[in-house]
């Protein structure tokens, strides 16, 4: 993630995990929402994936064991991008998972909108059986 942030020519980052298959409706217009993550409330992801708590359309926490899931896609811009870049550049945080860094951002006051596009189709590929 740090390499992508450092290579950015502007203060915008679309983060997509590499083991996903999704349709165009999943990310179409994502930048219109400002800093946001895609969430899943329709059991498209396994129970053991990272979930989110949401209050008034904002993510308040990322953690395991939650019903709504983070769809492993996020868009960060402006102040959120700057903080993400700062947190990712720290060597002591290099072993943290992205969702742990997102929680640090939320604790510092960054607002991350939760978005679930109506026509989103998304699937995580863990093995050939998932195709």
Q: Where in this protein do the model-derived segments appear?
A:
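Conserved glycosyltransferase catalytic-site signature
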Residues: 1, 20, 95-102, 128
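Short phosphate-binding loop-to-helix
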Residues: 1-13
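A structural signal for short hydrophobic beta-strand segments in well-ordered beta-sheet cores
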Residues: 4, 52-54, 114
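Short beta-strand-to-loop acidic/aromatic patch adjacent to the donor-nucleotide binding site
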Residues: 11-21
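Conserved core of the sugar-phosphate nucleotidyltransferase
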Residues: 22-92, 99
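Short acidic-glycine loop/turn motifs at beta-strand connectors
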Residues: 53-58, 107, 118-119
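Catalytic donor-sugar/metal-binding loop of nucleotide-sugar-dependent glycosyltransferases
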Residues: 103-117
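Active-site donor/metal-binding and catalytic loop motifs
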Residues: 116-126
